[in-house]
Amino acid sequence: VSLASNASQTFTNNAIQLSTVPRCIYIWASRANSSKTIETSDTFLKINSLSLNYLNVSGQFSSMSLQDLYQICAKNGCNLSYSEWSGKCMTIGDSHTAPAVVGMVGSVLKLDIADLHIPSNVASGMNVNSQLSYTIGVENIDQTQAIPVQLTTCVVYDGLMTIESGSMSSMI
């Protein structure tokens, strides 16, 4: 799906089957890989809203504002300013030019397991069969062109990987 400049749309991801409780989850929307070139920037669409379903708890984060989502990301290690993360800022005009909107980095959500509403007897790394799904509202912050949208979810687990004598073993 291509999203026009400054347009917003809601997307729903396909449910992801998980067998272990993750440490954190990254969610972002960006230009589709198939349309990236050497001339396109590594930026993201602005995330306006999120409603996440995990461990039979639906609607998580659905009442949060853009500022609330940014605060979660900042708490979880994001070092972007609010303007950079939310994707837009204004230039200062002068007597010859009017102020203009400038697209910035855009939003990547990092949700720590502690941010999720999960049962108190469940912790990161536990073997629990579950599904993760979400509906996300995004906005194309590119000021000039439509962008084909790609949703990405990165689920992070704690673990240990050992590389020795050319072979690898892992413990999750």
Where in the sequence are the language-model features?
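Flexible assembly/topogenesis modules
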Residues: V1-I172
